[in-house]
């Protein structure tokens, strides 16, 4: 179980480990039994002393065989390939998944959700950290599809007249401009909401266009190779070298003609953690964003990474000296002022008191779900409203509140109208 929660500012998993340790340990034991796994290990940072105490107490009280593995405080400790190496010493090969080396990694909230599933409860509510420029940084549990604006209101609102919201963490999250907040809704994969000033460092970074990025690379890249030296995947022995990609980009060759270059194709191995552009690059360039753009171009061209056969991958010997401390990463990301906030407040929205929700039919990287209900159908919270497409990877979708269905004509979402305005009733998790 990945309890590192390495993104600065996010504290949802830490809250669950402190307050729901017994449920997590019971679920872990059952998962181990059901799957026949040899071990169940919870990896979390050694600095999480309160969380460690709660988990150790639950393990002792339940007589569990679950083990704890204490990590250093660095970013991205929670990257699944990084955490596999930290715990087991095994290197996941490039473009492979942890299962290829006999491991499965799930985060804390996922294990909590599996515990709900064991009890017959579908996934309809999401835990979130709401922090930054809000009156009361808070851990929320809200129905999937809750308006982002309501989540901010639950945290006491913001004093800012102009702001952005980061969906996720400051390193890997996506920016929601203020104008788009009223039309943004909680999804299954949303981990946190960070409210920041409109002129914050994160907002400025997100305003750089692809053309500007390329021009910056041409004029300012000094080929120091710090991006490659600090890259977590390169340090695991993977052949990605961001500085070489930036060098090719600065040559002026059209992107379409670069896609056959082996160095450019290695952009597919980027985990998009952001260490290269936010922490390593002394010139403020954007190797991660370039890699993300190239990955999309490679996908459009139908080019997939081909791992050479017979190659054994080993972590680089200098890896231990090149881990980026979490607090310094937060400072470089421009959110250092919020990093040490202790968030113990919790607020759970009662689904029976919730207002209208909007559930996207594309909740993850799989195929969009297919509605199993029609316009005007009444539904109860927990009822299935969309199914995974046949012969495709995806997920089912369940009503997070009770109400009447309204399906988007373009097939993007299902809205459930409860006939109520938003009302907040505090509950225990």
Language model feature labels by segment:
Residues 369-378, 382:
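Short histidine-centered loop motifs in beta-beta connectors
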Residues 344-367, 388, 396-399:
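Short beta-strand-turn/beta-hairpin segments enriched in glycine/proline and small hydrophobics
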Residues 1-13, 134:
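Gly-rich Lys/Arg/Thr-decorated short loops/hinges at beta-loop-alpha junctions or inter-strand turns
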Residues 196-218, 228, 233-315, 375:
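Ferredoxin-type iron-sulfur electron-transfer modules in oxidoreductases and energy-metabolism complexes
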Residues 380-394, 412-415:
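Short hydrophobic beta/alpha edge segments that flank linear recognition/processing sites
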Residues 90-94, 98-99, 107, 308-350, ...:
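Extended boundary segments
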Residues 18-35:
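Histidine-anchored nucleotide/phosphate-binding helix
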Residues 38-150, 154-161, 167-169, 175-179:
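Hydrophobic alpha-helical positions that pack around
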